[in-house]
């Protein structure tokens, strides 16, 4: 999971869900009474192996509604010393968190492309730097994966043992 978040560029600030065929799996949302399989009951790898699918959807930040279609490429034997999974291609840069979903991102790009836009200075203050949607920042992915791996180890150690059971 942390490798996927890092590759996509998200900060892991929101709930997420995977959709493999008609089955959904992900982080439990206490406000949602859906049929999602809780993330602690199976793994994405197990779901993919059980269904045999070659692509799946990754839904992130239910409020903004980001939907990613992820295709599984060539599956080969592991090579000693290589880190897996590997990102083989990326199209475009990840939008900033909490930008308002696809419509908000489109507006953000419009504003950031025009330094004369009345909201340019405000967007620059919020984002903190110029934004190039074509700069995928591939050089940052290994560092992001390392960061998320360390962060998740710490956060999982602090999780409560309490489990929510549907009745």
PLM features: what roles do these ranges have?
Residues 1-167:
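Short linear regulatory motifs enriched in tryptophan with gly/pro/ser
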């Amino acid at each position: 999971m942390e490798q996927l978040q890092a590759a996509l560029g998200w900060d892991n600030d929101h709930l997420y869900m995977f959709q493999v065929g008609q089955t959904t799996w992900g982080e439990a949302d206490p406000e949602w009474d859906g049929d999602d399989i809780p993330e602690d009951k199976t793994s994405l790898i197990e779901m993919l192996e059980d269904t045999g699918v070659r692509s799946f959807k990754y839904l992130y930040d239910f409020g903004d509604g980001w939907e990613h279609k992820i295709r599984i490429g060539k599956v080969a034997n592991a090579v000693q010393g290589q880190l897996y999974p590997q990102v083989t291609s990326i199209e475009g840069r990840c939008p900033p968190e909490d930008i308002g979903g696809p419509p908000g991102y489109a507006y953000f790009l419009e504003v950031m492309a025009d330094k004369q836009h009345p909201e340019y200075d405000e967007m620059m203050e919020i984002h903190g730097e110029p934004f190039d949607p074509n700069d995928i920042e591939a050089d940052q992915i290994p560092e992001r994966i390392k960061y998320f791996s360390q962060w998740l180890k710490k956060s999982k150690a602090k999780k409560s043992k309490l489990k929510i059971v549907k009745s």
